[in-house]
């Protein structure tokens, strides 16, 4: 199952997604490789490969699952060393007990959690790990708060990281035990166009008609104009992990 906002927005604006989204902190990538990089790693909702690329470069065997064709095409072009497949978290195209780690980077909030957790439990080997990874913006800076206010006008009922419904669903599933919770500041060097691209890559903004997208872009450009030609977009990179009962 793919939410309409994701299906429409990401299909139309995969390029903006790739330009506007931050990479993950090198320490987070190193931690993933060290603690979760052994065996087969299945990445759900892999997008354009923002996390897939450094994992494969570090020698991790990644099976990347992505439902949106435009994102999947970009992913396959950018990361030829990954196995790239069409699929969803609710219908994973892998055999029972076939992978060691299931990874969801910036994606678990999109899933139908009960159905996805059933599928994740099915494809994981006993004592396999479920790992979620996120880049989360720091809302304390006034310009970031202003950015969020503009973007969130269009959110409606779109699933969001900040609801934490995704985490409650995992923590409430008795098959999974929380084992890791880690974060690091991850300032992302950017420029005014990069922040506009970040806004346009937001699923529900990308699904708007062109006139509304243009209005969002103009408002965001006005917010960041005083920041100059280059500046940091304040993020933190987060990782949470759970172990499947063996």
Where are these regions (language model features)?
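Conserved class I S-adenosyl-L-methionine
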Residues: 1-37, 39-45
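Conserved catalytic/acceptor-binding region of the Class I
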Residues: 118-188
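Conserved Class I S-adenosyl-L-methionine
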Residues: 168-246
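A short, conserved alpha-helix within the catalytic core of class I
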Residues: 111-119
């Amino acid at each position: 199952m793919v939410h309409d906002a994701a299906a429409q927005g990401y299909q139309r604006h995969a390029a903006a997604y790739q330009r506007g989204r931050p990479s993950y902190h090198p320490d987070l990538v190193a931690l993933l490789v060290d603690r979760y990089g052994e065996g087969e790693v299945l990445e759900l909702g892999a997008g354009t490969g923002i996390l897939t690329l450094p994992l494969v470069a570090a020698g991790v065997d990644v099976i990347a699952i992505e439902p949106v064709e435009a994102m999947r095409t970009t992913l396959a072009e950018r990361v030829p060393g990954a196995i790239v497949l069409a699929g969803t978290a609710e219908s994973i195209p892998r055999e029972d007990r076939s992978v060691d780690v299931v990874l969801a980077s910036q994606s678990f909030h999109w899933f139908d959690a009960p159905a996805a957790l059933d599928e994740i439990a099915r494809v994981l080997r006993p004592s396999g790990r479920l790992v979620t990874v996120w880049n989360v913006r720091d809302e304390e800076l006034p310009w970031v708060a202003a950015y969020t206010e503009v973007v969130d006008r269009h959110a409606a009922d779109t699933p969001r990281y900040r609801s934490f419904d995704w985490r409650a669903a995992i923590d409430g599933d008795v098959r999974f035990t929380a084992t890791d919770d880690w974060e690091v500041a991850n300032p992302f060097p950017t420029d005014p166009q990069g922040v506009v691209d970040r806004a346009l890559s937001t699923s529900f903004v990308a699904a708007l008609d062109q006139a509304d997208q243009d209005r969002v872009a103009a408002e965001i450009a006005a917010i960041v104009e005083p920041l100059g030609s280059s500046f940091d977009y304040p993020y933190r990179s987060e990782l949470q992990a759970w172990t499947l009962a063996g």
